Structure formats: C-alpha cells, structure tokens
Amino acid sequence: MYKKQLIIIFLFLFFISYAQTEFITLWKPNVNGTIDNSITFGGTGTSYTISWEEVGYPQHSGLMNSVTSNSSSPITISFGTSLNTNPLQATYKLKVSNGSGLFYGFRASPDYINPNANLELTEISQWGDIIWLQQFNTAFAGCPNLNVTASDTPNLTQINNLSQMFFNCSSLAGNNSFSNWNTSTITNMNGMFSRAKLFNQNIGTWNTANVTDFSGMFSFAAAFNQNISGWNTAAGTNFSVMFKDAVAFNQPLNSWNTKNATNLRYVFSNAAAFNQPLNNWNTSKVTSFEYMFENAVSFNQPIGNWDVSKVSSFAGFNMFNGALLFDQDISTWNIKLQNFAGNSMSFGFKNSGLSCTNYSNFLIALNNNPAWANSTITSGNIDATGLVYSTPQAIMARAQLVNKGFTIIGDSYNSGCFLSTVETSKKITTPAYPNPTTGVITVESTENENVYVYDITGKIIKNMTLNKGKNSIDLTGYPSGNYLLKGNHIFTKIIKK
C-alpha cells in the first residue's frame, strides 16, 4: 500500500512538473468607449482551450473547449455583463492552452497597418510553453495599449520571422525578460520595434547570426538606446531605415560585420543623437546610401575609407542633406560612374556641415574621376545649399561638371576659405547656457557673426546676428528636440527640453 502511494505521488509530481503553462493576456473590451464586452481573438489552432475571468471578479468566468480557429478570421469572445461598476474599465484575463489539440499562432488584427487596429489587448503576462509554429510577423502590430510584463520568454525555435512583431506598439516598455529571448532561428527582424516609442530593453545578447533583414527594426523607436555592438550581423543584407528617427540612439556599431550589406538607405536618417565611428564597416556590396545620414544632426565621423564602388542608383549618394555637423573628406571615394545605367546621378549636401575645403576637394575629385571615359552619365544633381567652394581648381571643376550636365544649386564662391587650417581655427564651439534649455538660452560669441538656428530636419527656424559678447536666443515657442546654431565660424548644439 505504501509503495502504491509513493508511485501515485511520483506520477502526480511528474505530471505537475510537465503541466502545461498557458499563453496569458489581458484585454479591455470597452476601451473604445462602446460597451459591448466582447473581443476578437486572432488565435490559430485546432481543438485548443480558452479560459477567461474578469479581473477583480473571479466568479465571472468562462471556459471554451475544442476551439478551432485561424488568425486570418478571428473568433469573437463575448464576456456577457461585466461585474465592474465601471464597465468601461472592465478587464479580462485570457488563458490559452493546447487543450486536446494544438494552439500555435496568434495575430492581434489582420489590419496591422492601422496603428489602432486592436485597442483592447493591453498585456502579455505569460508566454507559456506554447511552441509557436505560425510566424510572428505583424503578430501584435497595431496594439497601441499593449505592454509585455511576462517574466518568461516565447518559444521561437520553430519560426524565423519576427518582422513588424511590435509595429506601432506605442505603449510597449517591456521588461528585462527580453534579454533572454532565443532568436537563433530568426532571419527577419524587419520593423520589429518600429514605432515602439517606449521600448528600451537590453537585447544586446540576442543571437542574430541568421538575420538577413534588419531594415526598419528600430525606426521611430524614440527611446531605444541600448548597446547592440555584440550582434552578429554577418548575414545581414538589408539595414535600410534601421535607426531612422531613433532620436535617442547613440551606441557603438563599428564592430558590426557588414560584408554582405547591400542596402543602407535611410539607416541613420533623423537619428539626431547618433555620432559613432563607422570606419570599419565593409560597404563593398552596397548599392545605395540614399539619405543614409539625412538630418543626422550630430554625425561627424570619418568615412572616407568606405568602398562605394557598387553604388548604382540615381540617388545612391544623396545622403548628407541636413547633416549639420558632418565635415569629413570623401574625395577619396572610388565612385564608379559607369555603374549608373540611368545616365544620371545625384549628391545631397544641403545644409550639411561640409567645409569649404572638403566641398572643394569633392568637386575636384568628382570632376577628375577617371571613370568619366567609360561613363554614360549626361546629367546629375548636386544640392550644395549653404556650402562654399574656393581655389582655382574647385572653380574649374565646378564649371566642368556643369558642362557635363550637372545642375549644382545653393553653393557660393569664397576666395578666402581655401586653407583647412584656417577653417579649423575659425570654427569655434560657442558657449551656450543653460543647455539643455526650457526656452531662452545665452550664447557667448567672440565676434559679430551672422548665424542660423536649424531644427532636426535641417530647416532654418531663426536667423540673426550675434554680437560680440553675450546674446539671448528665445526658443520658448519651439518644440522639444535638438537644434543647431551655425554660422561661418561658429556652431553649437542646443537641446530644448
């Protein structure tokens, strides 16, 4: 009898240890102001089980057995009449398990492009031991009220696509469990945290060895600023838009292996804080850098050693518009003019920080490019708004480029700016305080100077003359963000709180 009891206890403990843990979520069905107390549930599986209860009122509960559904055609779950005295705040906990069948997929809404596609889903509190077989691309996209509080992690071993998984999840803050995710099978992280403006979890240990598509992964993720320098990016081909409008991001990336990268379009566009070295990046296969540093107002790192020999798209070098501080020599770039089958090409330096010396050297190098002999280019555009050129060689180079069909706009000639040492000595970081500021900032100038204040888009919002000594600039009526005060000889970055 005693042995029999031991066996029963052992079997009980054995099954308990292997007991299934559910996928648990929280929902507010009436959050949109209409009291219908029902939700659409985009689960995928056969003969699975859903149990639910009203949070705070456990006596109000229900059980659904043998559920078979597909996330492309969500089922409706009706909770009846809420016991909450304020039905608009009624919250329901759903627990989903395999039951007698298999639950293996979820999508919050088929209309994932809509930023408010699913207002009702508010929390993932447990991933459970569900083995996800349906790809997680767009799984929670369009859930602006969703946060993940689960301390466990999803089992991703049978899928490879996390693209746009949390797209437009504007309330997603997450927790430190994200650092434990096993992403070793994932190949696509396109837009995974795009527009998840609160997300800033440490995911630097993720296994990204198989990821080929990083495009848009942190675009518009305004808070994200974690060190991901240890990621294995050797398989990556598409990095376009990866940090576009990730305004806080400023972490080292120079150790990344980009040997297979072909698309670097918009990678740091509007990434206002980013200013990290990238000189170790292998760009030998890149076909387009279009708008890569557009309005990257802090970026000023040497990239003159980049291999740009594969660039072939018309706007492939239209990459520095609004890069207010960028002032590096790119005259050594091996631009292959014969790659441009469309007979035209463009360069973008509008309102960039390119000095007279570096802009002059660029004009000379482009005009003297030995590939002209094999090129079919008959036209081109150079937006050089705000730039200055000098030296007889630069004057001649510019004129010859115009004769070759180039339209060059916005630049001007200044005979007195041809010595880089003179430029460097005149370019002074102007004392400005308090910085950050809530409105009025005091700027000290060593001379009288015409200056401009640029916003993050490169737009001039103020122009004025600084007098020698202390000057006041009022930004009270302008939104919070990064601004740049810039003249011919001085510049300073201003942060408006």
Whereabouts are the PLM-identified features?
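Short, structurally constrained coil/turn elements
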Residues: 13-15, 402, 426
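N-terminal cationic leader/targeting segments used for protein routing and processing
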Residues: 4-5, 226, 233, 239, ...
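Bacterial Sec-dependent N-terminal signal peptides
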Residues: 1-22, 421, 484-487
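A generic hydrophobic-helix recognition signal that picks specific residues
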Residues: 5, 26, 428-432
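C-terminal outer-membrane/trafficking sorting elements
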Residues: 424-497
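Alpha-helix initiation and N-capping motif
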Residues: 5, 394-395, 435
